Design a protein with these regions (language model features):
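Cell-envelope/extracellular polymer assembly enzymes that use nucleotide-activated donors
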Residues: 7-9, 42
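Short, well-formed alpha-helical segments that are part of the catalytic scaffolds
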Residues: 17-33
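A conserved acidic beta->alpha catalytic loop
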Residues: 47-56
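Active-site-proximal specificity loops/subdomain of glycosyltransferases
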Residues: 63-105
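Short beta-strand-to-loop acidic/aromatic patch adjacent to the donor-nucleotide binding site
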Residues: 107-118
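Conserved donor-nucleotide/metal-binding helix-loop-beta segment in metal-dependent transferases, i.e.
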Residues: 120-143
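Short beta-strand-to-loop element that shapes/binds the nucleotide-sugar donor at the catalytic cleft/hinge
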Residues: 138-152, 167
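Terminal low-complexity segments of carbohydrate-biosynthetic enzymes
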Residues: 244-409
């Protein structure tokens, strides 16, 4: 199908997503019809070889295939294209194909959606696209309305680490949805990340880091409610992918973040969502029990990663507090930064370093959940902000030690 120049392009990477793709496609169709009726629009499905009929569902879908809706009819044809990508299955190759298509069609605004995000709405799709299309932003990150106890891998580790390093307050640095400009796409396509492990499993984090470190005009916009995402990746594998990607991004972008101090708020291109969200039903006991059980087994490994004072504090905490432990902010920050430095030094196989961090992360998360499971959302948000500030205050020591490692190489 010849499409030519387009105004708005939405890309959806897929691999065996027949069970979830239909509401995503429907939301895109409705966003095109309601909010961009005069624009040339195209939906690109970049498929990694699905065997469940996902591409056919995309090609045959329509905006009202599950219910009758009243929309402003588009004045232009909405194009749908489903095409396989080549190479190792993974979002990196799919995103590369989507960006290549956007570059070829000179798309003014591009949004990327996850095929598992079944709760995405037409308004959410439009909220991502508008800042690029109408306000000339280069990169748009979503802000979900979700309870602050939800998503602890982001709130306890990735968000404060990325904020302290890059100096920008991005609430969802690992979000599978984002929007970007043709200028940012041209930049991304020139980078050497696509055939790497980071490109295969950590492309979402890399895109965020590249936008911040590349000096592009970035913003955030509200999406409500938090889309339901059905992850099919086991926790251990997901943790290793996300943390390894974050550490690798910090290596790649060190020239940008090492001189930065503090953090700045990222511009808001739209109102933040305000709907009420229930807290996750957990008190963290199971996580702290796993920490207390596994820490001693990891002692030999941790001796090669952590400083003596940090390791001694962890062992003492596990011995005296057990499953009722309180993992202080300062100790958690020291833990994460020392793991990052060990990752850079290569004290052992990098996957083993990251795997050793997982039980400590569970202990920190369990401790936080136990402490704040009954707290008001405002109190939890204040505690998360305090954690971010601890990461920022400890950054000068990290920078000094990082630079010392560079001098030794």
């Amino acid at each position: 199908m010849a499409v030519g120049h387009v105004d708005v392009l939405v890309g959806v990477p897929t691999l065996n997503n027949a069970g979830t793709i239909r509401p995503v496609v429907k939301a895109v169709h409705q966003a095109f019809s309601r909010y961009f009726p005069r624009d040339r629009t195209v939906l690109i499905n970049s498929d990694g070889g699905s065997e469940d009929g996902t591409p056919n569902l995309v090609r045959n879908a329509s905006a009202d295939d599950t219910e009758t809706v009243t929309v402003l009819h588009s004045l232009r044809t909405i194009h749908r294209i489903s095409t396989p990508y080549h190479g190792v299955p993974g979002k990196g190759n799919a995103l590369r194909q989507i960006m290549t298509a956007a570059d070829l069609t000179q798309a003014r605004a591009v949004a990327v959606l996850n095929a598992d995000v079944t709760g995405i709405t037409p308004e959410g799709v439009a909220s991502l696209i508008r800042p690029v299309r109408d306000q000339q932003y280069d990169y748009v990150a979503p802000v979900y309305r979700r309870h602050p106890l939800d998503g602890p891998l982001v709130t306890q580790l990735i968000r404060p680490l990325m904020r302290a390093a890059y100096g920008w307050q991005v609430r969802e640095p690992v979000a599978p949805e984002f929007a970007c400009s043709s200028r940012f796409i041209a930049h991304c396509l020139e980078q050497d990340v696509w055939d790497s492990e980071l490109g295969r499993v950590g492309i979402d984090l890399w895109v965020t880091g590249e936008a911040l470190a590349g000096g592009f005009r970035c913003c955030q916009t509200g999406i409500s409610p938090h889309p339901t995402m059905l992850s099919r990746t086991p926790f251990g594998e997901l943790f290793e992918q996300v943390v390894s990607s974050a550490f690798t991004c910090l290596e790649r972008h060190s020239a940008y973040w090492l001189p930065r101090h503090g953090s700045d708020a990222l511009a808001l291109a739209g109102p933040l969502p305000t709907s009420t969200i229930e807290a996750p039903a957990t008190d963290g006991s199971r996580l702290t029990e796993a920490f207390a059980r596994d820490l001693d087994n990891l002692r030999y490994v941790l001796e090669s990663i952590l400083g003596e004072q940090t390791l001694a504090s962890l062992l003492r905490m596990a011995e005296t507090q057990g499953s009722h432990l309180r993992y202080p902010d300062e100790l958690w920050v020291s833990t994460v930064y020392e793991f990052l430095l060990a990752y850079r030094r290569g004290v052992m196989r990098r996957e083993h370093i990251v795997q050793a961090l997982a039980p400590l992360y569970l202990g920190r998360t369990g401790s936080f959940l136990r402490q704040f499971s009954s707290a008001h959302e405002t109190e939890v948000e204040e505690a998360l902000e305090s954690l971010c500030l601890h990461f920022e205050r400890a950054k000068p020591d990290l920078v000094q030690r990082w630079n010392h490692l560079g001098a030794l190489h």
